[in-house]
């Protein structure tokens, strides 16, 4: 195995917290933390070994960079330190991202240097022009989507001609860019923040292909700027494989996919069940889900609803329960109001996928108190060299054991 050199930004940028050269050690540390966390409700010896990230380096399919500016006017485009006072880190290398992403970062820096009148956005005061630069990478072709987010406030609005300069710099490069999107962030006091999206080059999506490792079941997905998609494509397929094995489908099940995002889990698992119902609150994501259902010819197997999980569960609390509920919520977890109505639905099996095991543990305690039993726990790494760990748990109703 080749020697891996540590990144020069290690411990500074707020990304990696452990040396890139010591991946095995960081994996053991994550596993130990998970064992200690779940020991009160599940025997650590029965937790399955952590599935390592593959690839360990340059596997991230999405990365967001922040524009930053000091009071003295010093600019940076990269990451922002997690400690106070906040500082911008103008990264010149990153072992987590593809080299093409770094090229886009450098092209955008050069464009910003040519426009000193553009200031970095400062969220606390809603001031400044340039917010973030996001790069998404498709798989397996590694085509690129680039998203520039700027302020929509009139006094900080970026002229279309200046945006055109940025777009042309990207197009004139040799990079495989298939989508360029300009977003305007609309933010005001006592009003929800939203984004006006402008497609300025190519398609409004990138393609992601997922293939389950064991049986080769494959799906193609159109992912839009604000659609959720697992940050490591190969690991995302493994998560779905684990969910399938935990579900042990017989072909007659109804599956409820809460927080369905772009529909990836439901679409991939629809090959093994009778019916899938997907629920998602983000309009961009549900549009992607509907599109992906058609692309994969699953319209007779899957229904999706633009609705928050709590409202959906409340509306269906008196209906026959689904056989399996798959939950892949944001970092904040299911939350009490959703949990309350989920327990009224009372499905036989719950497969809980989480990127925040601490919240997952707390909510599993509530599920256990309500009559569920943890059957299996499978951790998986998606964020090498960081403290974050994905965890997949199978819970079954005690009366169905």
From Swiss-Prot:
Superkingdom per UniProt: Bacteria
> Which CDD domains did the record assign?
AdoMet_MTases (cd02440)
| Molecular-function GO terms, alphabetical | 4 iron, 4 sulfur cluster binding; metal ion binding; rRNA (uridine-C5-)-methyltransferase activity
Question: Keyword set for this entry?
Answer: 4Fe-4S, Iron, Iron-sulfur, Metal-binding, Methyltransferase, S-adenosyl-L-methionine, Transferase
Which residue spans traverse the membrane?
A: none
Task: Give me the residues that bind S-adenosyl-L-methionine, please.
Answer: 230, 259, 280, 328
Query: Sorted alphabetically, which Gene3D superfamilies does this protein's record hold?
Result: 2.40.50.1070, Vaccinia Virus protein VP39
Q: Which GO terms describe its biological process?
A: rRNA base methylation
**Pfam families xref list:** tRNA_U5-meth_tr (PF05958)
What family does the entry list? Belongs to the class I-like SAM-binding methyltransferase superfamily. RNA M5U methyltransferase family.
In Swiss-Prot or TrEMBL terms, this protein is called Uncharacterized RNA methyltransferase CCA_00883
């Amino acid at each position: 195995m080749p020697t891996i050199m540590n990144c020069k930004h290690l411990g500074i940028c707020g990304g990696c917290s452990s040396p890139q050269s010591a991946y095995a050690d960081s994996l053991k540390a994550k596993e130990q933390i998970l064992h200690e966390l779940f020991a009160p409700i599940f025997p650590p010896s029965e937790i399955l070994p952590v599935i390592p990230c593959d690839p360990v380096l340059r596997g991230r399919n999405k990365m967001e960079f922040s524009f930053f500016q000091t009071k003295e006017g010093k600019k940076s485009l990269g990451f922002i330190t997690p400690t106070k006072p906040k500082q911008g880190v103008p990264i010149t290398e990153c072992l987590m991202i593809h080299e093409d992403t770094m090229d886009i970062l450098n092209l955008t820096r050069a464009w910003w240097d040519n426009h000193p009148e553009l200031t970095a956005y400062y969220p606390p005061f809603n001031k400044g022009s340039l917010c973030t630069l996001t790069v998404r990478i498709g798989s397996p072709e590694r085509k690129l989507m680039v998203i520039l987010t700027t302020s929509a406030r009139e006094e900080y609005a970026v002229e279309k001609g200046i945006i055109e300069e940025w777009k042309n710099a990207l197009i004139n490069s040799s990079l495989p860019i298939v989508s360029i999107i300009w977003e305007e962030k609309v933010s005001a006091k006592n009003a929800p923040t939203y984004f006006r999206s402008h497609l300025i080059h190519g398609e409004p999506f990138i393609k992601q292909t997922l293939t389950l490792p064991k049986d080769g079941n494959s799906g193609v997905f159109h992912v839009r700027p604000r659609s959720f998609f697992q940050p490591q494509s190969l690991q995302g397929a493994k998560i779905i494989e684990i969910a399938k094995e935990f579900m042990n489908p017989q072909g007659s099940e109804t599956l409820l996919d809460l927080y369905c995002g772009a529909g990836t889990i439901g679409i991939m698992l629809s090959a093994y069940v009778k019916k899938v119902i997907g629920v998602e609150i983000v309009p961009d994501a549900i549009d992607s889900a509907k599109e992906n259902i058609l692309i994969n010819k699953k319209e007779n197997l899957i229904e999706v609803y633009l609705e928050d999980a709590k409202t959906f569960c409340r509306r269906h609390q008196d209906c026959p329960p689904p056989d399996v509920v798959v939950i892949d919520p944001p970092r904040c977890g299911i939350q009490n109001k959703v949990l309350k109505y989920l327990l009224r639905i009372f499905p036989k099996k719950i497969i809980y996928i989480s990127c925040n095991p601490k919240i997952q543990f707390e909510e599993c305690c509530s599920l256990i108190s309500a009559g569920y039993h943890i059957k299996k726990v499978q951790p998986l790494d998606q964020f090498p060299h960081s403290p974050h760990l994905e965890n997949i748990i199978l819970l079954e109703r005690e009366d169905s054991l």
